[in-house]
Amino acid sequence: MRKLFTSESVTEGHPDKICDQISDAILDAILEKDPNGRVACETTVTTGIVNVMGEISTNCYVDIPKIVRKTVREIGYTRAKYGFDCDTCAVVTSIDEQSADIAMGVDEALESKKGEMDKIDAVGAGDQGMMFGYATNETKEFMPMPIALAHRLSRRLAEVRKDGTLDYLRPDGKTQVTIEYEDDKPVRVDAIVISTQHGPEIGHEQIEKDLIEKVVKYVISPELLDENTKYYINPTGRFVVGGPQGDSGLTGRKIIVDTYGGYGRHGGGAFSGKDPTKVDRSAAYAARWVAKNLVAAGIADKLEIQLAYAIGVAKPVSISVDTFGTGKIEESKIVEIVEKVFDLRPGAIIRDLNLKRPIYRQVAAYGHFGRLDVELPWEQLDRVEAIKKYL
């Protein structure tokens, strides 16, 4: 049976991604000085202005406007003619402390208050909610091929812009890849969409030629491309006005780009700007860690795990696994293995993945999972042998 599946990615200069990177740059700056800092930082951008708001509790000082300007500069908005400029944009901040009602549940979990467990691991979940992790053996990243290729294209767009290969490109851009599957295996690229901001002096034909040769064919294996692959390069014909001048941006609006490109489910919680006591982030990272190790251990060809939490309670209220018919053992047995091999209390996740570190800005663009360019604790295959002992 043949089917098509499509996923998208965006570049670091996309308005929503600017916001994610600013929020995580602020988080990193705080964690560098205060590993126990509590951060829930939201950012919005529009023409000429950045708004930073949220709840932050810390014993350190960070210069938020300076961090904002540095982040925007690194992304590439360095000239007023781009419609957004790191040196001249206004930066407005509105920061409160974390609610004491939330803090009392996170600082000491319900189980600890009842004397049921040690306080080291009894950090309560920072909120209720469900988080999903996913992994598949169809790519070396253990990621679905559509999102893996879309991220490679987006990252390449930034590379050729920054190194001067295509110096007429500007920071904003999006990519989209449609993969054809046969019997659940990826066999070819059916369609590629690239929309990238550019200078007004360059013609559409030149952009199309350059992007196919220096972006698409640079990152996608030739055996996946054929004479029937369709290319849609800046299909409107012109993309000069972009970035925050073209669209306002907001932290947490690219949650599918951040995860699995629509393959598998999503609990709805965004990642950026949140310290690891927020299970929206830490438990989603743990779920990916669990799923990837299970697939690498040969338990299934693809696997999704759901974790659910209650605010102020350490242990997950539920763990669920779906192997989509590819599992080698019963799903109930897989859940038992997960409970034996992984400690999924928030405090244990933070400890085992060493999450109280400034490691988040680097994943705020081009995906939080399946990254081959950076070392991430939740991508390590360090529980495979422990899992195999139960098979």
UniProtKB/Swiss-Prot annotation:
Its cofactor is Mg(2+); K(+). L-methionine binds at E55, Q98, D247, K278. Pathway: Amino-acid biosynthesis; S-adenosyl-L-methionine biosynthesis; S-adenosyl-L-methionine from L-methionine: step 1/1. Keywords: ATP-binding, Cytoplasm, Magnesium, Metal-binding, Nucleotide-binding, One-carbon metabolism, Potassium, Transferase. PANTHER family: S-ADENOSYLMETHIONINE SYNTHETASE. One of its GO terms (molecular function) is magnesium ion binding. Residues 98-108 are annotated as: Flexible loop. The keyword Amino-acid biosynthesis does not apply. NCBIfam families: metK. HAMAP family: S_AdoMet_synth1. Belongs to the AdoMet synthase family. It comes from Clostridium acetobutylicum (strain ATCC 824 / DSM 792 / JCM 1419 / IAM 19013 / LMG 5710 / NBRC 13948 / NRRL B-527 / VKM B-1787 / 2291 / W). It comes from the Bacteria. K(+) binds at E42. Pfam families: S-AdoMet_synt_C, S-AdoMet_synt_M, S-AdoMet_synt_N. GO terms for biological process: one-carbon metabolic process; S-adenosylmethionine biosynthetic process. It is an enzyme of class 2 (transferase). This is S-adenosylmethionine synthase. InterPro entries: ADOMET_SYNTHASE_CS (IPR022631), S-AdoMet_synt_C (IPR022630), S-AdoMet_synt_central (IPR022629), S-AdoMet_synt_N (IPR022628), S-AdoMet_synthetase (IPR002133), S-AdoMet_synthetase_sfam (IPR022636). It is found in: Cytoplasm. It catalyses: L-methionine + ATP + H2O = S-adenosyl-L-methionine + phosphate + diphosphate. SUPFAM superfamilies: S-adenosylmethionine synthetase. One of its GO terms (cellular component) is cytoplasm.
